Amino acid sequence: MASTRPGVQERILLHLRDYVDYAEKVEVPFAISQMGIANAVSIARSNVPRAISGMKESGHLIERQAHVTGVSRKRKAYFLTTEGVSLADSIWDK
């Protein structure tokens, strides 16, 4: 049986799953900024807000301004909620 590649939202969930420990941190890694997510899941940076909008509305993801390592100004960073972590875990288990 051939396995299918996860969709963009699923890839974002799996990527952010590795960074749940940073949800309360003041400074966060570049990987959870828009550009970091875009690089990790192979999409254009301009497509990240569109890809995550449904996840924010469904309560799987939160967005906040944070200091990103290596960047002088605050940027939007994205974090999984408890529900998002559960969903990412179930996707990973597939």
Question: Where on the chain are the PLM-derived regions?
Answer:
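A short alpha-helical element within helix-turn-helix/winged-helix DNA-binding domains
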Residues: 29-40
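Short helix-capping/hinge SLiMs at alpha-helix to coil transitions
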Residues: 18-29
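Short, cationic-aromatic polyanion-contact patches
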Residues: 66-90
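Short amphipathic alpha-helical interaction segments
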Residues: 42-57
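A short, conserved structural fragment
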Residues: 56-67
